[in-house]
């Protein structure tokens, strides 16, 4: 067992020890965990990311619901202890199904077990990967002038993310910290929400023309994708820009990359890239380019109003853009730029926006 895994195991056992000590002292056991809401995140000046504040939620056995939560946590810790000792791993989905045999500690649905794993991350200051818990989702793909070194079952190999891959690109592994950056000729990184737009840039040779590393986000990005973007920015000193659809859900995708997500604010210093810049699609672009658009739904309007009270978006840029979007009552997709031809996005829109941002 690696040293970091030994420390992780000690931290997990420490939680159970704390519960036991409270019960031995005749106390009702309880745990205090950071509240995971937008009202409990604060800006860390040193790391420039959003992290949890001082508000705590109490998991107490005083209530039946609280007692079940603590019971389920002890079962999960017991499972993780065995898994670490055997050097095995499991997925979040497998953990949910394994609980079928735990009687009263069985999870009713997977989101419940997922949240409990997040609780353990917060309580121990370790990541789920240190518990040997893997996500279901794959990491996204990368294509561009970057050479990486990775360990495989057959040993160490080097891969050039342009020359040694097909149009699908290089698959980002679950544990990004296991890959090493060997060298690169890149000038910036562009993270793209949709597969269709990612394919358009690749087909048009955008990565070659502008020495860009293209990262496909696949919608809301996996942790591995966000970790890769942070490493490319901090270790290789490459500017990172994010290109999404023009709707509130896509702005949240940008926020998870740049500021850190509310759900995983305990990992913001590891996953977030505060230097990341938003390319578009902006509401300003919808008006400026007269893009094909859909009317905002009630859910869209509700989400936009929520953004106006989200501290991560507390800037003049976002206030102006969100208020404009509410005013025009429209949203547009990235691919709406095809109104002006398939090459417009790579020949006109992106060069103009990247020049405005000082990237090219």
From Swiss-Prot:
Signal peptide: none annotated. GO terms for cellular component: chromosome. It holds the Pfam family Topo_VI_alpha. Residues 3-140 form the Topo IIA-type catalytic domain. The active site is at 97 (o-(5'-phospho-dna)-tyrosine intermediate). One of its GO terms (molecular function) is DNA binding. It catalyses: ATP-dependent breakage, passage and rejoining of double-stranded DNA. Transmembrane segments: none annotated. GO terms for biological process: DNA topological change. InterPro entries: Spo11/TopoVI_A, Spo11/TopoVI_A_N, Spo11/TopoVI_A_sf, Topo_VI_alpha, TopoVI_A, TOPRIM_Topo6A/Spo11, WH-like_DNA-bd_sf. Its EC number is 5.6.2.2. Mg(2+) binds at residues 193, 245. Keywords: ATP-binding, DNA-binding, Isomerase, Magnesium, Metal-binding, Nucleotide-binding, Topoisomerase. Its cofactor is Mg(2+). HAMAP family: Top6A. PANTHER family: MEIOTIC RECOMBINATION PROTEIN SPO11. Belongs to the TOP6A family. Homodimer. Heterotetramer of two Top6A and two Top6B chains. Relaxes both positive and negative superturns and exhibits a strong decatenase activity. This is Type 2 DNA topoisomerase 6 subunit A. The gene is top6A.
């Amino acid at each position: 067992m690696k040293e970091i895994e030994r420390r992780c195991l000690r931290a997990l056992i420490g939680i159970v020890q704390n519960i036991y000590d409270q019960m031995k002292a005749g106390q009702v056991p309880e745990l205090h965990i950071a509240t995971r809401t937008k009202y409990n995140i604060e800006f860390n000046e040193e790391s420039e990311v959003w992290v949890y504040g001082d508000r705590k939620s109490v998991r107490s056995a005083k209530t039946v619901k609280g007692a079940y939560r603590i019971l389920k946590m002890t079962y999960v810790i017991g499972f993780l202890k065995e898994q670490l000792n055997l050097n095995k791993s499991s997925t979040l989905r497998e953990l949910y199904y394994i609980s079928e045999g735990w009687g009263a500690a069985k999870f009713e649905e997977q989101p419940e077990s997922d949240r409990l794993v997040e609780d353990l991350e917060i309580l121990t200051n370790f990541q789920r990967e240190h518990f040997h818990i893997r996500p279901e989702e794959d990491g996204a793909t990368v294509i561009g002038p970057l050479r990486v070194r990775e360990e495989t079952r057959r040993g160490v190999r080097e891969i050039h993310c342009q020359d040694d891959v097909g149009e699908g690109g290089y698959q980002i592994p679950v544990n990004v910290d296991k890959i090493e950056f060997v060298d690169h000729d890149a000038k910036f990184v562009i993270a793209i929400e949709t597969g269709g737009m990612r394919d358009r840039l690749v087909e048009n040779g955008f990565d070659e023309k502008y020495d860009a590393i293209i990262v496909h986000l696949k919608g809301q990005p996996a942790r591995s994708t966000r970790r890769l973007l942070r490493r490319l920015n901090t270790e290789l000193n490459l500017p990172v820009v994010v290109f999404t659809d023009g709707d509130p859900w896509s702005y949240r995708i940008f926020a998870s990359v740049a500021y850190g997500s509310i759900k995983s604010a305990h990992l913001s210093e590891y996953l977030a890239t505060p230097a990341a810049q938003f390319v578009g699609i902006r509401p300003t672009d919808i008006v400026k380019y007269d893009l094909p658009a859909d009317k905002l739904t009630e859910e869209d309007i509700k989400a936009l109003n929520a953004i106006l009270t989200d501290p991560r978006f507390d800037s003049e840029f976002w206030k102006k853009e969100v208020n404009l979007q509410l005013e025009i009552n429209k949203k547009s997709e990235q691919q709406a730029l095809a109104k002006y031809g398939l090459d417009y996005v790579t020949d006109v829109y992106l060069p103009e926006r990247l020049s405005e941002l000082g990237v090219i």
